[in-house]
Amino acid sequence: MQIKEVQEKLKISSYTLRYYEKMGLIQPYRDENGYRNYSEEDIHKIERIMFLRDINVPIEDIKDILNNKVTFQDVLESHIQKVNTEIESLQYIKKHV
Protein backbone atom coordinates (compact mmCIF):
# COMPACT_ATOMS: atom_id res chain seq x y z
CA MET A 1 0.00 0.00 0.00
CA GLN A 2 1.48 3.34 -1.01
CA ILE A 3 1.56 6.45 1.18
CA LYS A 4 -1.51 8.02 -0.45
CA GLU A 5 -3.57 4.89 0.25
CA VAL A 6 -2.42 4.82 3.87
CA GLN A 7 -3.33 8.51 4.23
CA GLU A 8 -6.84 7.84 2.99
CA LYS A 9 -7.37 4.63 4.95
CA LEU A 10 -6.11 5.96 8.29
CA LYS A 11 -6.90 9.68 7.88
CA ILE A 12 -3.28 10.58 8.57
CA SER A 13 -1.03 13.10 6.84
CA SER A 14 1.98 12.14 4.76
CA TYR A 15 3.98 14.49 6.99
CA THR A 16 3.04 12.42 10.05
CA LEU A 17 3.91 9.16 8.30
CA ARG A 18 7.30 10.54 7.31
CA TYR A 19 7.83 11.82 10.86
CA TYR A 20 7.08 8.36 12.29
CA GLU A 21 9.59 6.94 9.83
CA LYS A 22 12.20 9.58 10.73
CA MET A 23 11.73 8.80 14.43
CA GLY A 24 12.28 5.09 13.77
CA LEU A 25 8.76 3.99 14.63
CA ILE A 26 8.04 2.48 11.21
CA GLN A 27 10.24 1.32 8.35
CA PRO A 28 8.13 0.90 5.21
CA TYR A 29 9.61 -1.06 2.33
CA ARG A 30 11.01 1.10 -0.47
CA ASP A 31 10.56 -0.13 -4.03
CA GLU A 32 13.12 0.28 -6.81
CA ASN A 33 11.81 3.81 -7.47
CA GLY A 34 12.13 4.80 -3.81
CA TYR A 35 8.38 4.83 -3.16
CA ARG A 36 7.26 3.78 0.29
CA ASN A 37 5.14 0.63 0.43
CA TYR A 38 3.35 -0.20 3.66
CA SER A 39 2.48 -3.76 4.65
CA GLU A 40 -0.55 -4.77 6.69
CA GLU A 41 1.81 -5.12 9.65
CA ASP A 42 2.93 -1.51 9.10
CA ILE A 43 -0.72 -0.41 8.99
CA HIS A 44 -1.47 -2.12 12.32
CA LYS A 45 1.66 -0.58 13.84
CA ILE A 46 0.62 2.89 12.63
CA GLU A 47 -2.83 2.39 14.15
CA ARG A 48 -1.24 1.55 17.51
CA ILE A 49 1.05 4.58 17.25
CA MET A 50 -1.91 6.83 16.42
CA PHE A 51 -3.85 5.54 19.45
CA LEU A 52 -0.90 6.12 21.76
CA ARG A 53 -0.29 9.61 20.37
CA ASP A 54 -4.00 10.42 20.77
CA ILE A 55 -3.64 9.79 24.49
CA ASN A 56 -0.38 11.79 24.60
CA VAL A 57 2.07 8.95 25.09
CA PRO A 58 5.55 10.33 24.24
CA ILE A 59 7.34 9.10 21.12
CA GLU A 60 10.18 7.65 23.21
CA ASP A 61 7.73 5.50 25.19
CA ILE A 62 6.13 4.33 21.94
CA LYS A 63 9.59 3.37 20.66
CA ASP A 64 10.17 1.34 23.81
CA ILE A 65 6.88 -0.51 23.28
CA LEU A 66 7.62 -1.23 19.62
CA ASN A 67 11.15 -2.42 20.46
CA ASN A 68 9.80 -4.66 23.26
CA LYS A 69 11.79 -2.81 25.93
CA VAL A 70 8.58 -2.34 27.94
CA THR A 71 5.11 -3.77 27.63
CA PHE A 72 2.13 -1.91 26.26
CA GLN A 73 0.42 -2.51 29.61
CA ASP A 74 3.31 -1.00 31.61
CA VAL A 75 3.32 2.17 29.52
CA LEU A 76 -0.45 2.54 29.77
CA GLU A 77 -0.41 2.06 33.54
CA SER A 78 2.35 4.65 33.89
CA HIS A 79 0.48 7.02 31.61
CA ILE A 80 -2.73 6.57 33.62
CA GLN A 81 -0.83 7.47 36.80
CA LYS A 82 0.51 10.64 35.14
CA VAL A 83 -2.98 11.59 33.93
CA ASN A 84 -4.45 11.01 37.39
CA THR A 85 -1.74 13.19 38.94
CA GLU A 86 -2.48 15.92 36.40
CA ILE A 87 -6.22 15.67 37.14
CA GLU A 88 -5.57 16.03 40.87
CA SER A 89 -3.38 19.05 40.24
CA LEU A 90 -5.98 20.70 38.02
CA GLN A 91 -8.74 20.00 40.55
CA TYR A 92 -6.63 21.62 43.27
CA ILE A 93 -6.07 24.69 41.08
CA LYS A 94 -9.78 24.88 40.24
CA LYS A 95 -10.70 24.65 43.90
CA HIS A 96 -8.39 27.53 44.81
CA VAL A 97 -9.21 29.90 41.98
Where are these regions (language model features)?
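Short, charged amphipathic alpha-helical surface segments
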Residues: D31, M50, I55, D61-V97
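Basic helix-turn-helix/winged-helix DNA-binding cores
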Residues: M1-E60
